[in-house]
Curated annotation (Swiss-Prot):
Database matches in HAMAP family: Lipoyl_synth
Organism in which the protein naturally occurs: Leifsonia xyli subsp. xyli (strain CTCB07)
Location of this chain's protein in the cell: Cytoplasm
Membership in a protein family: Belongs to the radical SAM superfamily. Lipoyl synthase family.
Keywords annotated in UniProt: 4Fe-4S, Cytoplasm, Iron, Iron-sulfur, Metal-binding, S-adenosyl-L-methionine, Transferase
Pathway info: Protein modification; protein lipoylation via endogenous pathway; protein N(6)-(lipoyl)lysine from octanoyl-[acyl-carrier-protein]: step 2/2
Range of residues in the leader sequence: none
Protein name as catalogued: Lipoyl synthase
Cofactor(s) for this UniProt protein: [4Fe-4S] cluster
Length: 329
Protein backbone atom coordinates (compact mmCIF):
# COMPACT_ATOMS: atom_id res chain seq x y z
CA UNK A 1 0.00 0.00 0.00
CA UNK A 2 1.33 3.44 -0.85
CA UNK A 3 1.63 6.22 1.72
CA UNK A 4 -0.98 8.33 -0.05
CA UNK A 5 -4.56 7.06 0.52
CA UNK A 6 -6.70 6.60 -2.56
CA UNK A 7 -9.30 9.28 -3.24
CA UNK A 8 -8.55 11.60 -0.30
CA UNK A 9 -5.87 13.77 1.26
CA UNK A 10 -3.78 12.46 4.11
CA UNK A 11 -4.98 13.31 7.60
CA UNK A 12 -2.69 15.30 9.90
CA UNK A 13 -2.21 12.16 11.97
CA UNK A 14 -1.15 10.26 8.85
CA UNK A 15 1.29 13.00 7.86
CA UNK A 16 2.83 12.78 11.34
CA UNK A 17 3.00 8.98 11.17
CA UNK A 18 4.70 9.15 7.77
CA UNK A 19 7.62 11.08 9.26
CA UNK A 20 8.75 7.80 10.85
CA UNK A 21 10.21 5.36 8.29
CA UNK A 22 8.88 1.81 8.10
CA UNK A 23 10.63 -0.26 10.75
CA UNK A 24 12.90 -3.20 9.98
CA UNK A 25 11.46 -6.45 11.31
CA UNK A 26 13.52 -8.43 13.83
CA UNK A 27 15.05 -11.75 12.85
CA UNK A 28 12.48 -13.84 14.73
CA UNK A 29 9.62 -12.66 12.50
CA UNK A 30 9.90 -15.17 9.68
CA UNK A 31 7.34 -17.07 7.64
CA UNK A 32 7.45 -20.60 6.24
CA UNK A 33 6.38 -20.74 2.60
CA UNK A 34 5.65 -24.47 2.41
CA UNK A 35 3.33 -25.04 -0.54
CA UNK A 36 1.58 -28.36 0.03
CA UNK A 37 -0.84 -30.09 -2.37
CA UNK A 38 -3.99 -28.59 -0.82
CA UNK A 39 -2.51 -25.09 -1.01
CA UNK A 40 -1.50 -25.56 -4.65
CA UNK A 41 -4.93 -26.85 -5.61
CA UNK A 42 -6.70 -24.02 -3.79
CA UNK A 43 -4.37 -21.39 -5.27
CA UNK A 44 -5.05 -22.69 -8.77
CA UNK A 45 -8.81 -22.71 -8.18
CA UNK A 46 -8.89 -19.18 -6.75
CA UNK A 47 -6.89 -17.88 -9.71
CA UNK A 48 -8.91 -19.68 -12.39
CA UNK A 49 -12.30 -18.81 -10.86
CA UNK A 50 -11.40 -15.19 -10.07
CA UNK A 51 -12.27 -15.63 -6.38
CA UNK A 52 -11.22 -13.11 -3.72
CA UNK A 53 -9.97 -13.79 -0.20
CA UNK A 54 -8.49 -11.55 2.47
CA UNK A 55 -5.70 -14.12 2.82
CA UNK A 56 -4.37 -13.41 -0.66
CA UNK A 57 -5.21 -9.73 -1.07
CA UNK A 58 -3.78 -8.72 2.32
CA UNK A 59 -0.66 -10.84 1.81
CA UNK A 60 -1.24 -12.83 5.02
CA UNK A 61 1.94 -14.65 6.09
CA UNK A 62 -0.06 -17.71 7.17
CA UNK A 63 -1.81 -18.35 3.85
CA UNK A 64 0.26 -21.48 3.11
CA UNK A 65 -0.80 -23.16 6.36
CA UNK A 66 -4.43 -22.07 6.37
CA UNK A 67 -5.08 -22.99 2.75
CA UNK A 68 -3.40 -26.35 3.27
CA UNK A 69 -6.07 -26.95 5.95
CA UNK A 70 -8.81 -25.54 3.68
CA UNK A 71 -9.46 -22.45 5.81
CA UNK A 72 -9.83 -18.94 4.35
CA UNK A 73 -11.08 -15.46 5.23
CA UNK A 74 -13.43 -13.21 3.25
CA UNK A 75 -14.10 -9.46 3.48
CA UNK A 76 -17.66 -8.21 2.97
CA UNK A 77 -19.29 -4.79 2.76
CA UNK A 78 -16.88 -3.24 0.28
CA UNK A 79 -13.31 -1.98 0.35
CA UNK A 80 -13.98 1.35 2.10
CA UNK A 81 -14.64 1.58 5.85
CA UNK A 82 -16.62 4.39 7.48
CA UNK A 83 -14.20 4.33 10.44
CA UNK A 84 -10.43 4.68 10.70
CA UNK A 85 -8.22 2.70 13.06
CA UNK A 86 -4.55 3.70 13.05
CA UNK A 87 -3.28 0.14 12.56
CA UNK A 88 -5.72 -1.07 9.91
CA UNK A 89 -4.85 -1.62 6.26
CA UNK A 90 -8.41 -1.05 5.01
CA UNK A 91 -8.94 2.44 3.61
CA UNK A 92 -11.40 4.93 5.08
CA UNK A 93 -13.85 6.65 2.76
CA UNK A 94 -17.32 6.66 1.28
CA UNK A 95 -18.41 3.04 0.81
CA UNK A 96 -19.76 1.67 -2.45
CA UNK A 97 -23.44 0.95 -2.94
CA UNK A 98 -24.82 -1.81 -0.73
CA UNK A 99 -24.62 -5.16 -2.52
CA UNK A 100 -27.40 -7.54 -1.42
CA UNK A 101 -26.08 -10.32 -3.64
CA UNK A 102 -22.70 -10.45 -1.91
CA UNK A 103 -23.67 -13.14 0.66
CA UNK A 104 -24.61 -15.56 -2.11
CA UNK A 105 -21.37 -14.95 -4.01
CA UNK A 106 -19.21 -15.37 -0.90
CA UNK A 107 -21.02 -18.61 -0.07
CA UNK A 108 -20.45 -19.84 -3.63
CA UNK A 109 -16.73 -19.11 -3.25
CA UNK A 110 -16.64 -21.05 0.02
CA UNK A 111 -18.38 -23.99 -1.68
CA UNK A 112 -16.17 -23.94 -4.78
CA UNK A 113 -13.04 -23.80 -2.63
CA UNK A 114 -14.24 -26.76 -0.60
CA UNK A 115 -13.41 -24.99 2.66
CA UNK A 116 -13.59 -26.80 5.99
CA UNK A 117 -13.82 -23.54 7.97
CA UNK A 118 -14.43 -19.97 6.81
CA UNK A 119 -13.93 -16.64 8.54
CA UNK A 120 -16.00 -13.67 7.36
CA UNK A 121 -15.07 -10.15 8.35
CA UNK A 122 -15.95 -6.77 6.91
CA UNK A 123 -15.86 -3.03 7.07
CA UNK A 124 -17.93 -0.81 9.35
CA UNK A 125 -20.96 0.52 7.49
CA UNK A 126 -22.23 3.41 9.62
CA UNK A 127 -23.84 4.79 6.44
CA UNK A 128 -26.48 2.03 6.55
CA UNK A 129 -29.51 2.06 8.84
CA UNK A 130 -28.64 -1.39 10.21
CA UNK A 131 -24.86 -0.74 9.99
CA UNK A 132 -24.57 -3.85 7.81
CA UNK A 133 -26.01 -6.34 10.34
CA UNK A 134 -28.21 -8.04 7.74
CA UNK A 135 -25.24 -8.46 5.40
CA UNK A 136 -23.20 -10.27 8.05
CA UNK A 137 -26.14 -12.44 9.12
CA UNK A 138 -27.16 -13.33 5.58
CA UNK A 139 -23.60 -14.32 4.69
CA UNK A 140 -23.56 -16.77 7.61
CA UNK A 141 -26.92 -18.19 6.54
CA UNK A 142 -25.85 -18.57 2.91
CA UNK A 143 -22.61 -20.36 3.77
CA UNK A 144 -24.46 -22.75 6.07
CA UNK A 145 -27.05 -23.35 3.35
CA UNK A 146 -24.58 -24.00 0.54
CA UNK A 147 -21.90 -25.75 2.64
CA UNK A 148 -23.47 -27.45 5.69
CA UNK A 149 -20.15 -29.09 6.55
CA UNK A 150 -18.23 -25.80 6.74
CA UNK A 151 -17.78 -23.86 9.97
CA UNK A 152 -18.41 -20.11 9.91
CA UNK A 153 -16.64 -17.59 12.11
CA UNK A 154 -17.95 -14.02 11.91
CA UNK A 155 -15.70 -11.09 12.87
CA UNK A 156 -17.81 -7.96 13.21
CA UNK A 157 -17.58 -4.25 14.02
CA UNK A 158 -19.56 -3.15 17.08
CA UNK A 159 -22.88 -2.13 15.42
CA UNK A 160 -22.83 0.71 17.98
CA UNK A 161 -23.54 -1.91 20.63
CA UNK A 162 -27.20 -2.04 19.55
CA UNK A 163 -28.77 -5.29 20.90
CA UNK A 164 -31.26 -5.45 18.02
CA UNK A 165 -28.55 -5.24 15.34
CA UNK A 166 -26.32 -7.69 17.16
CA UNK A 167 -29.31 -9.98 17.62
CA UNK A 168 -29.66 -10.18 13.83
CA UNK A 169 -26.15 -11.64 13.65
CA UNK A 170 -26.59 -13.89 16.69
CA UNK A 171 -29.74 -15.35 15.13
CA UNK A 172 -27.74 -16.65 12.15
CA UNK A 173 -25.82 -18.87 14.61
CA UNK A 174 -22.20 -18.66 13.49
CA UNK A 175 -19.86 -21.25 14.98
CA UNK A 176 -17.86 -18.35 16.47
CA UNK A 177 -18.84 -14.73 17.12
CA UNK A 178 -15.73 -12.54 17.14
CA UNK A 179 -15.23 -8.88 17.94
CA UNK A 180 -11.67 -7.64 18.32
CA UNK A 181 -10.80 -5.21 21.12
CA UNK A 182 -7.24 -4.97 19.70
CA UNK A 183 -5.62 -2.75 22.36
CA UNK A 184 -5.68 -1.54 25.96
CA UNK A 185 -7.92 1.21 27.46
CA UNK A 186 -5.24 3.90 27.88
CA UNK A 187 -4.46 4.14 24.15
CA UNK A 188 -7.74 2.76 22.80
CA UNK A 189 -9.37 6.08 21.87
CA UNK A 190 -6.25 7.34 20.09
CA UNK A 191 -5.90 4.19 18.01
CA UNK A 192 -9.61 3.32 17.53
CA UNK A 193 -11.40 6.70 17.85
CA UNK A 194 -14.78 5.52 16.52
CA UNK A 195 -14.91 2.57 18.93
CA UNK A 196 -15.17 2.41 22.73
CA UNK A 197 -13.37 -0.11 24.92
CA UNK A 198 -16.27 -0.76 27.29
CA UNK A 199 -18.72 -0.98 24.39
CA UNK A 200 -16.55 -3.58 22.70
CA UNK A 201 -16.51 -5.64 25.90
CA UNK A 202 -20.30 -5.36 26.04
CA UNK A 203 -20.60 -6.59 22.44
CA UNK A 204 -18.68 -9.72 23.44
CA UNK A 205 -20.82 -10.11 26.57
CA UNK A 206 -23.96 -9.98 24.42
CA UNK A 207 -22.56 -12.70 22.16
CA UNK A 208 -21.82 -14.90 25.15
CA UNK A 209 -25.32 -14.32 26.54
CA UNK A 210 -26.71 -15.49 23.18
CA UNK A 211 -24.99 -18.83 23.71
CA UNK A 212 -22.27 -18.38 21.10
CA UNK A 213 -18.57 -19.22 21.29
CA UNK A 214 -16.91 -15.80 21.56
CA UNK A 215 -13.51 -14.57 20.46
CA UNK A 216 -11.31 -11.47 20.50
CA UNK A 217 -7.80 -10.34 19.60
CA UNK A 218 -5.05 -8.17 21.09
CA UNK A 219 -2.36 -6.52 18.94
CA UNK A 220 0.90 -5.76 20.74
CA UNK A 221 3.50 -3.15 19.86
CA UNK A 222 1.21 -0.12 19.60
CA UNK A 223 2.27 1.61 22.83
CA UNK A 224 0.76 -0.60 25.53
CA UNK A 225 2.62 -1.55 28.72
CA UNK A 226 3.04 -5.10 29.98
CA UNK A 227 0.69 -4.83 32.97
CA UNK A 228 -1.97 -3.27 30.74
CA UNK A 229 -2.00 -6.41 28.60
CA UNK A 230 -2.69 -8.52 31.68
CA UNK A 231 -5.57 -6.26 32.65
CA UNK A 232 -7.03 -6.37 29.13
CA UNK A 233 -6.88 -10.17 29.19
CA UNK A 234 -8.74 -10.20 32.49
CA UNK A 235 -11.31 -7.70 31.16
CA UNK A 236 -11.92 -9.85 28.09
CA UNK A 237 -12.33 -13.01 30.13
CA UNK A 238 -14.68 -11.27 32.56
CA UNK A 239 -16.78 -10.10 29.59
CA UNK A 240 -17.22 -13.71 28.46
CA UNK A 241 -14.53 -14.17 25.82
CA UNK A 242 -13.84 -17.86 25.16
CA UNK A 243 -10.99 -17.59 22.63
CA UNK A 244 -8.15 -15.06 22.53
CA UNK A 245 -5.44 -14.49 19.93
CA UNK A 246 -2.44 -12.27 20.64
CA UNK A 247 -0.23 -10.91 17.88
CA UNK A 248 2.48 -8.41 16.91
CA UNK A 249 1.56 -5.16 15.17
CA UNK A 250 3.07 -4.95 11.69
CA UNK A 251 2.76 -1.51 10.14
CA UNK A 252 0.85 -1.60 6.81
CA UNK A 253 2.25 1.66 5.37
CA UNK A 254 4.13 4.84 6.38
CA UNK A 255 0.84 6.66 7.10
CA UNK A 256 -0.09 4.13 9.80
CA UNK A 257 0.91 4.12 13.46
CA UNK A 258 4.66 3.47 13.91
CA UNK A 259 5.63 0.27 15.72
CA UNK A 260 6.32 1.06 19.38
CA UNK A 261 8.17 -2.18 20.15
CA UNK A 262 8.88 -5.67 18.87
CA UNK A 263 7.56 -8.28 21.27
CA UNK A 264 9.94 -11.20 21.69
CA UNK A 265 8.68 -14.80 21.33
CA UNK A 266 9.27 -15.56 25.02
CA UNK A 267 6.83 -12.80 26.01
CA UNK A 268 4.19 -14.33 23.73
CA UNK A 269 4.76 -17.69 25.46
CA UNK A 270 4.39 -15.97 28.83
CA UNK A 271 1.14 -14.31 27.72
CA UNK A 272 -0.20 -17.58 26.32
CA UNK A 273 0.40 -19.28 29.66
CA UNK A 274 -1.17 -16.34 31.49
CA UNK A 275 -4.28 -16.39 29.29
CA UNK A 276 -4.69 -20.13 29.79
CA UNK A 277 -4.35 -19.67 33.56
CA UNK A 278 -7.02 -16.94 33.51
CA UNK A 279 -9.38 -19.46 31.94
CA UNK A 280 -9.63 -18.82 28.19
CA UNK A 281 -10.72 -21.99 26.40
CA UNK A 282 -8.55 -21.39 23.34
CA UNK A 283 -5.35 -19.33 23.10
CA UNK A 284 -2.91 -18.65 20.28
CA UNK A 285 -0.08 -16.15 20.74
CA UNK A 286 2.83 -15.30 18.49
CA UNK A 287 4.30 -12.55 16.31
CA UNK A 288 2.58 -13.83 13.15
CA UNK A 289 -0.63 -15.15 14.70
CA UNK A 290 -3.69 -13.44 13.23
CA UNK A 291 -7.22 -13.50 14.61
CA UNK A 292 -8.37 -16.03 12.00
CA UNK A 293 -5.27 -18.24 12.34
CA UNK A 294 -6.11 -21.90 13.10
CA UNK A 295 -9.64 -20.66 13.74
CA UNK A 296 -11.33 -24.00 13.18
CA UNK A 297 -9.10 -25.79 15.65
CA UNK A 298 -9.69 -23.14 18.34
CA UNK A 299 -13.46 -23.42 17.86
CA UNK A 300 -13.43 -27.23 18.17
CA UNK A 301 -11.16 -26.98 21.22
CA UNK A 302 -13.54 -24.51 22.87
CA UNK A 303 -16.59 -26.64 22.10
CA UNK A 304 -15.02 -29.63 23.82
CA UNK A 305 -13.94 -27.52 26.79
CA UNK A 306 -17.57 -26.43 27.21
CA UNK A 307 -18.71 -30.04 27.03
CA UNK A 308 -20.51 -29.46 23.74
CA UNK A 309 -20.57 -31.97 20.92
CA UNK A 310 -18.65 -31.01 17.80
CA UNK A 311 -20.90 -31.92 14.84
CA UNK A 312 -19.63 -34.98 12.98
CA UNK A 313 -19.07 -33.04 9.75
CA UNK A 314 -16.76 -30.63 11.63
CA UNK A 315 -14.85 -33.05 13.88
CA UNK A 316 -11.84 -32.96 11.58
CA UNK A 317 -11.17 -29.42 12.84
CA UNK A 318 -10.25 -30.71 16.30
CA UNK A 319 -7.32 -32.61 14.81
CA UNK A 320 -5.69 -29.63 13.08
CA UNK A 321 -2.18 -28.75 14.26
CA UNK A 322 -1.25 -25.69 16.30
CA UNK A 323 0.72 -24.26 13.39
CA UNK A 324 4.07 -22.55 12.94
CA UNK A 325 2.96 -19.05 13.99
CA UNK A 326 2.31 -20.08 17.60
CA UNK A 327 5.17 -18.93 19.83
CA UNK A 328 7.00 -21.76 21.61
CA UNK A 329 9.36 -21.76 24.55
Amino acid sequence: MSAEPEGRRMLRLEVRNAQTPIERKPEWIKTRATMGPEYRQLHSLVKSEGLHTVCQEAGCPNIYECWEDREATFLIGGSQCTRRCDFCQIDTGKPAEFDRDEPRRVAESVARMGLRYSTVTGVARDDLEDEGAWLYAETIREIHRQSPGTGVEILVPDFSGDPELLGEVFGARPEVFAHNVETVPRIFKRIRPAFRYERSLDVIAQGRAAGLITKSNLILGMGEERQEISQALQDLHDAGTDIITITQYLRPSPRHLPVARWVRPDEFVELRDEAEAIGFLGVLAGPLVRSSYRAGRLWAQSMRAKGRTVPEELRHLADASLGFAQAVS
